[in-house]
């Protein structure tokens, strides 16, 4: 999209198209749906933005209240601090009228999947796009069967999805959230910053 800087455009081929794939490519997201996004990293923030473009409601989770405040400024209707609210799945159901959310953008993996299954509504969808808590763990698959939950693995996206996403970004003049831009000589510092979890959105390196 012509309105983006080089750094902003560089965030699109991986994080952005992954979020688009989750909600649009493999989903049927529509206005009025409720989406739960875990955390405030690159994919989750893009998912928040794309969901809002579609007229959906977004609930965000984070371990930091200041990040939740920024998510609300970006369009989330509610934020849940999972440190102070460990049963964030119950809170998500409360915020969605007791039925559960329509979509979960799942970044935690084995450590959070069971709670995501409790947070999502019967017939809802969980898009697994990351395993930040690790891949090993015990998850009871029975709720997936009995409540008709769709769990979909998402890994980046196709060229067709990428082109459709870019048309939507251009039409709405959407701007990716780039937290910090590091010069190439400070690449190590950039990775350390990202590893610290302090970032909100994307971290870019400019050569």
Give, region by region, the residue ranges found by the protein language model:
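Glycine-rich phosphate-binding loop and adjacent beta-alpha segment
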Residues: 54, 71-72, 107-177, 181, ...
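Hydrophobic/small residue at the entry helix of a nucleotide-binding pocket
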Residues: 18, 43, 111
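C-terminal capping/lid region of NAD(P)-dependent oxidoreductase domains
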Residues: 98, 173-177, 189-207
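Glycine/charged-rich beta-loop-alpha catalytic/anionic-binding loops adjacent to active sites
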Residues: 1-6, 70, 98, 172
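NAD(P)H dinucleotide-binding glycine-rich loop of Rossmann-like/cofactor-binding domains
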Residues: 1-38, 73
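Glycine-rich adenosine-cofactor-binding loop
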Residues: 39-47
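Adenosine-nucleotide cofactor-binding segment
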Residues: 34-40, 52-115
């Amino acid at each position: 999209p012509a309105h983006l800087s080089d750094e902003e455009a560089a965030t699109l081929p991986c994080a952005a198209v992954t979020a688009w794939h989750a909600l649009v490519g493999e989903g049927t997201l529509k206005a009025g749906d409720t989406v739960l996004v875990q955390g405030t990293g690159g994919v989750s923030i893009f998912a928040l933005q794309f969901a809002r473009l579609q007229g959906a409601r977004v609930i965000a989770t984070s371990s930091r209240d200041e990040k939740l405040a920024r998510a609300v400024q970006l369009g989330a209707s509610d934020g849940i601090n999972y440190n102070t609210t460990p049963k964030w799945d119950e809170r998500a159901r409360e915020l969605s009228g007791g039925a559960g959310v329509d979509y979960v953008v799942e970044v935690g993996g084995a450590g959070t999947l069971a709670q995501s299954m409790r947070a999502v509504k019967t017939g809802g969808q969980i898009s697994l796009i990351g395993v930040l808590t690790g891949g090993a763990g015990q998850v009871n698959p029975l709720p997936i069967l009995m409540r008709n939950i769709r769990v979909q693995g998402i890994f980046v996206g196709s060229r067709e999805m990428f082109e459709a996403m870019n048309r939507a970004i251009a039409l709405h003049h959407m701007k990716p959230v780039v937290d910090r831009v590091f010069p190439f000589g400070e690449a190590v510092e950039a990775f350390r910053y990202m590893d610290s979890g302090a970032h909100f959105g994307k971290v870019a390196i400019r050569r």
